[in-house]
Amino acid sequence: MKTIAIDAMGGENAPKAIVDAVLKAKPKLKDTKFVLFGDEEKINELIPAEQKDRIDVIATSEVIIDSDEPVKAIRRKKNSSMVVAANYVKSGKADALFSLGNTGALLACGIFIIGRIKGVERPALMPTLPSAKSEDGFNIIDVGANAQSKPEYLVQWAQMANFYAQKIRNIKNPTVALLNNGAEDDKGDALHQEAYKLLKATDLNFIGNAEGNDLMEGKADVIVTDGFTGNATLKAIEGTASVILRLLKDSLLNNGLRPKVGALLAKPGLTALKKRFDTARYGGAVLLGVNAPVVKTHGRSNIRPIYYTLLQIDKMLSQDLVGEYKKYFSESR
């Protein structure tokens, strides 16, 4: 039986949204056990008596909040829901770690407590984002786990993302592109020029450089980038999408009868558009390169994205993604 350790106190809607998502996922994931860490009384009162099978609750007395400095927090708040859950995974009692809490602290838990895979230079954070070309979206790695990068790191990140796209997204031969400031192969600074050469020499389906305007068009299944650029890109995409949706809603609903009628007529198309750019169904961002799946979902998440993230984690465990990484990087050393 697979076991997922869950920080039940992370995020704005904890613990209710987390418990509700577990209860929703439980009938579908019949071979999975859920261990929730946090305020035992609050968590237990949300779980009906008839639903307590395959759900364990472990009491913790502290919570890492967003304003906490990540590394200091995991050292000082040793009885926090996130740290205790991470140690539970490290001990082998659980197979994966999931949290909606402080991103930096979760990355620190993954790297310093659960530990990186031998042969992996630097773990990296990777979400799946929507694209206009495909309902499958695209992966972008790294989006902030590393402030500084080397060309060799980008190659390993591309290799890990390639495995993920194959095993979890069911893409037989994923296309991989390097985020750069031009399409030509000599574009970019020394880091990107060397990364380009190294990626081209691998057996990946590397299609060259991708510019910022290519991402949402779906030029590649996997986009590899340094952590600084990736983080800025992710926030720009999220912010732009949020503003466009807000402006669209405001223009349709707050400008009289005619736009409202138009919105009603356009509803099927708008529904399809909303579905295409619905990030919840992709699950959370994954810290790749550590000894167990470590997955982060946005702190504002409600039941739906949490539910899909639980399905995502379960598939990662079923496909033994970490085992594939360990085998690959041990053989390539």
Curated annotation (Swiss-Prot):
This is Phosphate acyltransferase. It comes from Lactobacillus johnsonii (strain CNCM I-12250 / La1 / NCC 533). One of its GO terms (molecular function) is phosphate:acyl-[acyl carrier protein] acyltransferase activity. InterPro entries: FA_synthesis, Phospholipid_synth_PlsX-like. Pfam families: FA_synthesis. Catalyzes the reversible formation of acyl-phosphate (acyl-PO(4)) from acyl-[acyl-carrier-protein] (acyl-ACP). This enzyme utilizes acyl-ACP as fatty acyl donor, but not acyl-CoA. Homodimer. Probably interacts with PlsY. GO terms for biological process: fatty acid biosynthetic process; phospholipid biosynthetic process.
